[in-house]
Design a protein with these regions (language model features):
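C-terminal motif of bacterial Sec signal peptides marking the signal peptidase cleavage site
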Residues: 15-18
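Short, polar/acidic, helix-capping and beta-turn segments at strand->helix junctions
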Residues: 20-186
Length: 186
């Protein structure tokens, strides 16, 4: 019992020191002011495309309070064509990863269009990754990592999110990947 009390006192003392420390507060403010996802995209050589128009009766994004919901999007290339095919037969895991990464770039373009300034992203909350895959394919997370790795590279800690990575028997237009997402914004 004495050991528990000593540990609690030590933890309380440490938290009081860190809470009252102006250096700790400044460090937090520095991290916030250094957050510049658009500069990060530039440094990575990524140029955001113009968001594509929805192909049916829906919109690319809907804001509800401080949440922005993005519709499912796919790996649309600069030439206007999608990366298509099934991972496990037509595409390798690496090609699927690149399709998911491209889908992430397209989703960031929609974020930019909706928000004007990507530094308004407070947190990527959730992504649902759907992989067009053969029935025996089991590496869906490795494919959707293309999206998740990009979000963390661009948004840092704010890019870490919850996620589903599932296989589908087919996707619209035979696209390789479709990903939708929920984002908390400022």
């Amino acid at each position: 019992m004495k050991k528990i009390i000593q540990t609690l006192i030590l933890c309380l003392g440490l938290s009081m020191v860190s809470c009252g420390s102006p250096q700790g507060q400044n460090k937090s403010e520095e991290v916030k002011s250094d957050f510049n996802p658009e500069a990060k995209l530039d440094s990575m050589g990524i140029v955001l495309p113009q968001p594509s128009a929805p192909v049916a009766n829906f919109v690319n994004s809907v804001q509800v309070g401080n949440l922005l919901f993005l519709s499912g999007n796919g790996p649309l290339k600069q030439d206007g064509k999608f990366i298509t095919g099934k991972v496990g037969s037509d595409l390798t895991i690496e090609e699927g990863y690149e399709a998911a990464r491209l889908t992430g770039i397209n989703q960031i373009a929609i974020l930019k269009s909706a928000l004007g300034d990507l530094s308004r992203v407070k947190r990527i909350i959730r992504a649902a990754g759907m992989v067009n895959a053969t029935p025996d394919f089991k590496q869906h997370p490795a494919v959707v990592n293309g999206f998740s790795d990009l979000m963390v590279a661009v948004f840092g800690e704010r890019g870490k999110h919850t996620r589903a990575a599932v296989g589908m028997v087919s996707l619209p237009f035979n696209i390789a990947v479709e990903i939708d997402m929920i984002v908390e914004i400022e």
